[in-house]
Curated annotation (Swiss-Prot):
[4Fe-4S] cluster binds at C36, C37, C101, C130. Binds 1 [4Fe-4S] cluster. It catalyses: a quinone + NADH + 5 H(+)(in) = a quinol + NAD(+) + 4 H(+)(out). NDH-1 shuttles electrons from NADH, via FMN and iron-sulfur (Fe-S) centers, to quinones in the respiratory chain. The immediate electron acceptor for the enzyme in this species is believed to be ubiquinone. Couples the redox reaction to proton translocation (for every two electrons transferred, four hydrogen ions are translocated across the cytoplasmic membrane), and thus conserves the redox energy in a proton gradient. Signal peptide: none annotated. NDH-1 is composed of 14 different subunits. Subunits NuoB, C, D, E, F, and G constitute the peripheral sector of the complex. Its EC number is 7.1.1.-. It is a peripheral membrane protein. One of its GO terms (cellular component) is plasma membrane. The gene is nuoB. NCBIfam families: nuoB_fam, PRK06411.1. PROSITE patterns: COMPLEX1_20K. It comes from Hydrogenobaculum sp. (strain Y04AAS1). This is NADH-quinone oxidoreductase subunit B. It is found in: Cell inner membrane.
Amino acid sequence: MASSINGNGFITTTVDELLSWGRRNALWPVTIGLACCAIEMMHAAASRFDIDRLGMIFRASPRQADVLIVAGTVVNKVAPMLKLVWDQMPEPKWCISMGGCASAGGPFPTYSTLQGIDRIIPVDVYIPGCPPTPQGLIYGLLELQRKIREKKVTRYEKAFEEFKKDLSPELLNGVGV
């Protein structure tokens, strides 16, 4: 967190930095595991790699999640349901495309396979591989945290516009925090 400690031991920061810190260190992913990438995702959540140590708790409901991890092949019949899950997630939300199938349709593109989930929902991080390793997923999640910290995810700013309207200008500029 970009903050400073003054002579009295208080930390001063801005509201945006505080919200960014909280968001990036408490990501709650909902998963769409459609193929072999889902096995690697489960492996990343198990005791050897323990994704929970990064502050991530998998959620079963999209209404309680802020990160969508799509792992595996998305066929055209599943695409509307994937869009529905994305629309049910509250803002700010982010998406990770895990594996070659979710990112580009897989090694054998067919008429029934969606050629990348970025055709229907915005993707923030792509994780390559067939299937990607658990280390690859963890690296992708750390990259998402870095993007949130550096505010390279534009939907993040849009999500707090209503919140910022209710605050006084002094708080928004970091004075009095």
